[in-house]
Each structure stands twice: as C-alpha cells, then as structure tokens.
Amino acid sequence: MGAAKKPAAAGVSTKAEREADLVMETNNSSIVSKRSVELLYYPKPHFFRYFVKRPPRRSPLINRGYWLRMHAMAESVRQFMKQPSDKPKFVLNLGCGFDPLPFILLSTDKSLCSTTRFVDIDYEKLMVNKKTAIRRTDEITRLLENVEFLSDESPIQIRSEQYLAIGCDLKNLKKLDDVLKTELLPSDCSILFLAEVSLTYMDVKSANAVLAWASKLNNDSQFCILEQFFPDGPNHPFASTMMKHFNKLGAPLYSIHEYRSLSEQEQRFRNAGWAHAQARSLWDLWSDNEFVGSSLRAWLDTVEPFDEWEEFALFASHYFLLVASTKPQTMVQELQKTPALTTEPDISSQYVLLAGNNPRGGQRRFGALIPDSENSMGHHSGLGRQTRDVSTDLYSTCKGMTTPQLPFPPREVSARMCHTVTSLRGGDCLLVGGRASPANAFQDCWLRQGKQWQSTKSLPAPRFRHSAVKITLETDSESVLVYGGKSSDGSIFDTWLLWQTHSNGWQEVEIQGARPPARFGACLESINQTTGVLFGGIGSDGIIIEDFWIWKIRHRSDGTVFLELTDHTEHLQQTPLSQYIYRFGSTVTRTSRGLVIVGGIIPRQIVPYECEIMLLDVGELLEYVENESSWGHRILSAIGLGGILQGARPLLVGHVACAIDPDQVLILGGGAVCFSFGTFWTEGGWVLKPAGSTAQNNWTLVPEAMHTPEPVASPKTPQISTALKLSSIRRIRVDTSEQFQQILADGKPVIIEGSDIGPCTELWTKEYLTDVVGSDRKVVVHESQSENMNFQAKNFSYVTKAFGDFLDEVHAGGRQYLRSISAELPSKLPANLAADFPGLKDDFKLPQALSLVTENAHSSPLRISGPVTMWLHYDVSSNTKQEGWKLRVADRYAQVMANVLCQIRGERRLVLFPPADVQYLQVPPGASSSTIDIFQNIKDGSIVSIPHTSPQEAVLNSGDILFIPPMWLHTASPTGGVSVAVNVFFRSLPKGYAAGRDVYGNRDLQAYEKARIDIQKMVRSFDGLPSDISRFYLLRLAQELKDNAGV
C-alpha cells in the first residue's frame, strides 16, 4: 500500500480507485514507522530500507508500538512454521503492502522456512511497484531461487521457489481463487493467512466474504489477523481520537463498528466457517512470557530510553491479534483469557464526578500538586503542549483570587515531570526528583518552609516515577517516605528512603521480613500515621506487578527505624475486584471513606469505565489484618466515573489528585498522546463527590501572568556587582583564510570588523523582511514574561504566530525572540538560512577569508530579538552519517561546534566565559545551559559577579562578526532596539561520539553522557555501606577526577 498513482484500469470506477488509493496511502506512514523500528531494534541485514526512501526516526512510543505489531505477526508465522507437518506450507499475506516480512524470515530463519512458501497479495498497481523495488535490490533477489519477474499485466508479478507476489484486489475473490488453485496451491497443504490492518479498510460485507472464502480454500488453514477494536467502547478518549484520525485520512475503519469486542470478533470467524478462533489484545500478549519473553522485554529498554507506558498500554489495548483455524485446535495453545468484567460491589450510584469549566490552558501531564490553601491549589511543571513546563497553574474556587497564598516553586527549580510533592504541616512541602528525559533523571530536592523555597539535601541517586508519602514518627516529627522509582540508566529501585524535617537529608530504611520487588510508578499511601499500602507499579521485566503489601514503620529503642512489610496478595485475590487494583501511574488519595484510586493502567486490558475509580475501604482492611480473617468482598468497590458522568469522558492518565474535603477528591490535568492519532487532553478540574452532596465544582484556572513566581535567593546564587570590570574582546580585521585558521588555533574569541557580509546590513529593515519573508509565514518564537529567559527554568513559551505579527510586536517592545528552525523538517534538519528563507539568501554572505566556516557549516539560523536576554549556554551538536542515523552510539558521531555570530541590524551585547569557568557557572549535570541570569539588570548593564571566573565582553554593531570558540559559554542582551543576526555554526574539531541528533546545536558529547551514567553506577556501588564511609570514598574519587582535569 503506498504506491504512486497510475491511470485507472479499464472497468474500474474513478470513485473506487480513489478509495483504493486512500487505503494504499495508509501504508506510507506504517512502512516508515516499521523502518524506524528496523533501524533501532533489528539486526542487519535490513529490508525495509529498500522500500523507504528516507531513514526515519519515530518517537519511542511509535517505535515500541510498531515493534509489538511486527513481533506479533512474525511470531505468529514462526509458530505456524514450527508446527510438525509433512505437508508443504504457504503463508498468504492479504494486503501485504510493502512489508518485507518474507525476506526477513528467509534471512534470519532460513532452516525454519525450508518447507514454507510466502505469497504477498495486494492491489495490482501496488504490487507492480513492489516488484520494481525488489528487482533492483540484489540483497533480496539473492535470497530467492529461480526468481522470475513477470509482466505488469500478469496476475503473478514475481515467482520464485520461496516467494510469489500476486496483484489482485481482495474484492475480486474469483480472480484470486483461480490464480491460487491453478498456479500455486497443491491439493494437500497447510495455509496461514495474514491480514495486518488490511481487511478493516474494506466494507464489512466484502471483508467477511474474504474470511468465508479463506475458510473453504483448504481444510488445513489458519488465519492470523491484527486489527483495531473497542475494548471499552467508541467513546473512550483513545478510541474516539483514533477514529477521528482515520476518518480525516479518508480511510475509515469499517469492521470495528460491526465487531467491537474480542468475543464479537471470535464469533465473526466462527460464522465465516472457522472451527476455532481466539482473540487477545496486544497489551495482553505483551504480558505473556510465551509470546514476548521477559528477557526480550527488558532488552527493549536497553535500545532506547522509554517511559511512555500509559500511552503504550492504551495503544496495545486497542489492537488485537486473532488466530483462527479450520481445525478444532489452533496453532497457539489455549491460554487463560481475561476474566469477564465484574463490578460487584458497585457503588457508582453513591458518587458523582463533576466536570469543571474547560479553560484555555491548564493542559499538562505528569506534574505534581502544590498545596496552597483550602480554596486554591497549584499544578506544578509536568509536560505541557509542546515541552516540559516550569510554571505552576493556579486553580481556585474564589473568583477574585489572582495570586497564590503561598509561593509556588521558583524558576530555579528546573522543568520536570514524574516528580513528587509531599504536603507537610503549615503549608510546608517537599519536592523530590523527577526527570527531563527518561535518560536524565533529577536528584535535587526542594523544601518550602516558612513560605520560602530552598534547596535541600539531594537524593542518594537520581530517580523519577517514585512514590512518596508523609508519615509521622513517634517523635511527632514529620517525615517523607520514598519508595522505588527509576534512574537515568534504566535501573529500578527497591529501596525505601526516609527524609526527616530535623535530620540531615536522606537515610535508607532497613527492611525486615519479605522485600517487595523493585518497581516504578507504584501506588503508595498511608492508612494511618505509620502504616500504609503498596501495590502495582512496573517491574524490571516491563509488566505491571500484581501484588498487595501492607507496610509499617517501627522504632527501636536506640532511635533507629525499620520497615516491616507483609504480603497480602493472596488475601486480596479473594475479593471479586482484585484484578482492577494492580495499577501503574494511578493516584491514591486518602479520604474519610477510604483510599480513592483514580485512573492509570492495569495488566492485560484497558481500565474499564466501570472501574476507572475504585475505593479501598481502610476500616475493613485494618479489621481483616488485625483479626487475621478472610477478606470480604466489601473491601474493594467500583466507583467507575460515578453514577451520572457530567461532561465528556476524561482520560485519567498523567493526572494528579488530592482530597479537598474529607469525602471529595479534586482531579487535575492528564491526557495522553494517542499513538500516531493525536493528543487527547483532560482539561479543567474534576471533582468526585458523594451523590448526596450539594457541593458544586467551582475550581477554575487563574491566568498564569498573574502569579508568575519570582526567583528566590539561595546561598549559592551569586550577587549583583555593578563594580565588576569586564575585559573587552579584541577587535581585528581578517583578510585571508590563513589569518582565520590562526584564530581557530588560538581558540580565543575575537570580533572581526570591516568584512563584507552582503547588502543585508542595509536591506533587512522591518518592512523589507515582512515583504520578502511574507507577513503570513508561520514562525515559532520564544515569548517571555520576564526580561531574562532561562532555559533551565523554561520561563518562556513557544508560540506559533505570523511573521508579520511577530515583527510588529517585537518592534513595539515585545519580549520575544526568534531563532529560526528548518522550514521543511524542523525535527530532523538544522536551520539553513538559504533553504528556509530563499528570498534572503542572496542578501547575506560570509567573507572569502571565512571559507573554512562555509565549507564546514552545520547550520545558519536567523535570529531576531527584542528586549530580552538569552540564557548562558555553550554549543555542541551531533550530526548524521550519510547512510542514515541510528540510536546506537557506534553509529553516530558528534561535532563540537564553533560559530560566527554576524550582527546584521541593531546592537547586541554579549558576555563570554572560557571553558574552564564552567565549574562555577551552575550548569546542571547533563545540561548545556546555566541556571544563572548573568544580566540581572538590563537598564544599568550590571552583571553578576561570580568568583573565580573571567568573563569577557563583546558589543556588536551592524557588520561585526563575533567568533565564539567551542565550549565558551555565552549570553546576549539587547542594548536598545531590535537585534537581527545570523549565526553560522561550523565543525571545528575532530569527531566524537554523540548522544543523538541535535538540530539546535545544544547536545553534549556522548563521552560525557556515558560518563554521567558511569558516575551513577559508581555511587550505587557503595550502597549498603555506612554513609560516612561512602562519603569518604566518593570524595577520594572526586579528587581523582579533579586531578585528571588539572584542577
């Protein structure tokens, strides 16, 4: 599917051909995504590459989803080929598209394929194109014996001993039947039909005709079909998003409306003449060790960092694999199916879920709640519409409220997700860990105490997706208990850490008795001051853990504490609803009625509507535990989404929740990327309340501009010094390339003046740029509420707007900044002034003396800035090999970047720091940007005075060129008016391994990234030793690193 169009064949209506073309177009995205999977996960030789022109890179979610689809189909074929039989075997792929599955199996499982012949079947014109691609590919034809390429008019396009390609519309079953019986199939053989998301594009009557025909073609046939279904109805947010996507493409799904459930699909096949049919969701198959082994699941995480578990489960729960057979026994063993849904005891009628107003904004996932007052709450950081958001949304029930009662986290707390915030007495709270990317976990912790935020003792190791709960020890001191989580290198923790308000940092808690397996994303909550429950989470084998523990923290006479854990899984399984409590990414909130469990994902199936919210009766639980009696059915009840859902169904993943009243729960945020179909956001605040309550949902979002947090002072933050004298960067003229090469060799910044950079210095006025670029051209700009943009704090927004509007606003004093990105492929290609702004390319040039820059150019972004300062950072970038880039380190390399900054219009002031100063500039591990705002006061030009540093200053006028050597940290500030400039980044040093593609020039060398992971492993090697001994040896190792760095 996915061929270029040809004139309509005789007898085929124009409408029918258009519909066929739309169906074939669905193959384009699919085959590209499979190529992405092949690049990362499959050993060579690769075969998708011959059908996909450009080497793609899909997101980890798309990669894992397609990996599972590909594995499901390939594993089904392997199981068929492994079945003992004296008959010849045939694998008929109905609607094969450009999928090269036969060639992959012939290459990797040659002996297994010895008695099997593969037959690809699809539209005539698609198979003509597939034939052309195969004919010109020696790597494929060498796998085939006695291969023949027949004419385009022939029903058989390719014939060989192992493989045939047939062009035939599946609605023309007579033609297909004749070809197979006369040209291919012997009277006695075994057949496996494959249909991977192909029959569902046919009308139901035609698709069912294919199934009935296939069941009668041979008395030893099996059918393997992979398609979408509705595990929880078409109104589920993922399902509705998926259907809108396919309808928008003009290729709607048909069978899914007629056969919504797995049981209906199984009955469909039995009605079509198949003796046996078994359907299972891909999420169910993912957890089956016979289908996807635990070691294989664990290996996937070593290929690329992955943390899109909720979205992966949603996708896999909406696709099924069905295997049917003409014989009573199927080719796969009969496995235990998911039990039928039971919701008893059902208390949904006792609750109501109230939807709030849907304001513009407030869209964030995987954030954390910040306590404020009885009538207000903050939703901090998390993942916004485009990136992680450093801000905190203020929700309030008071109409006149504009600012929080207590301070929200300052911008020094870098944007993060999957972190925790635990409420303490008097409005205090503790923020712990989190992550940027899954490979960049945070170790820092922040305490709000006495209405002020301050950095507190960091975690022993970075972690995210951990669980945290407040406990009160016998000394009446408040503490925070943290369990589990995941680190940057993929390690999963089973440790319990204790933070106490009056102690120095974190201590690992000793465990007595059984120890729960390591996990992340678990459900942890207290049921009194020192006792609580633990359940769910994902373990090291990539599946949700189905257990239930009760923990109790105890004191010894010497003041130390230990944790006592008891496994009550068997007791819980006596209750009818136990299968729905084992969750990942759920919230657990303590209320007067018990623990309210909201959303998340569960093993093997989607969370059904009736069990989205559940109630664990704490009183019943404690009674059963104390009396050691059997657990009754009342301990766990289903609330669902209440008796009557008011509003559209929310998607309860990535959300946050808290008790706002003894028996009311507030739910904020959430949503998910619904695979490749679009993003669904749960907006506004939702309130779960008892049905008899008269309370209303008055929670609304307060506009962010009213409560933007100010930075707080920290003992480590440098203070402003207006008396600081900066050394000026020298100005020189450069007339020859030899002179510039000497500048490179010196490795010091210089301002090159008197060079000809083209007529841009005169032409690029506001009016000229608007006319040439186009007033309506869409650009993405940084829009800031502050005059100091901070990349770590993400105190700005990415806003898409018309270029003309941007110029109007920035010339009117708007705090905006444009750093152009690739117009064609912004996520894959670096900015290129000539390609992105062709109308400007003849206006700008580099002088001949800088030919080395032109010859080694990486990117050339256009920069237009108003009265706003840039963050302090350094530049380093990765690039791609010609044959296509891969995630594996050995296949990619980085280039340390130098750059020349060409000032076109206006004036710009820059401050630069030499590489050796980086240790004093508060650049977080793994980052290339500092947290310090160098320009603390734009009006008087003062900058921070930082001990042990040697800042240098450059003031650029129109026509000046600033050479910035590699690793020199730099920041820029306007000196009045609008600044227009062009950067040209170029490769100035030998190759070094990279951490990945970076079109913006801000990613570090792989050697550094790898070393950071090694440091984390080094720290963990001292686990179990007394803290003073661990500290002693870590300090010795730190000194060795300093010695090697020459410090």
UniProtKB/Swiss-Prot annotation:
GO terms, molecular function: tRNA methyltransferase activity
Pathway assignment: tRNA modification; wybutosine-tRNA(Phe) biosynthesis
BP terms from Gene Ontology: tRNA methylation; wybutosine biosynthetic process
Domain JmjC: 814-1003
Annotated SUPFAM superfamilies: Clavaminate synthase-like, Galactose oxidase, central domain, S-adenosyl-L-methionine-dependent methyltransferases
Family assignment from sequence similarity: Belongs to the methyltransferase superfamily. LCMT family.
Task of the protein: Probable S-adenosyl-L-methionine-dependent methyltransferase that acts as a component of the wybutosine biosynthesis pathway. Wybutosine is a hyper modified guanosine with a tricyclic base found at the 3'-position adjacent to the anticodon of eukaryotic phenylalanine tRNA. May methylate the carboxyl group of leucine residues to form alpha-leucine ester residues.
Protein name: tRNA wybutosine-synthesizing protein 4
Origin species: Aspergillus fumigatus (strain ATCC MYA-4609 / CBS 101355 / FGSC A1100 / Af293)
Lineage, top ranks: Eukaryota, Fungi, Dikarya, Ascomycota, Pezizomycotina
Gene this protein is translated from: ppm2
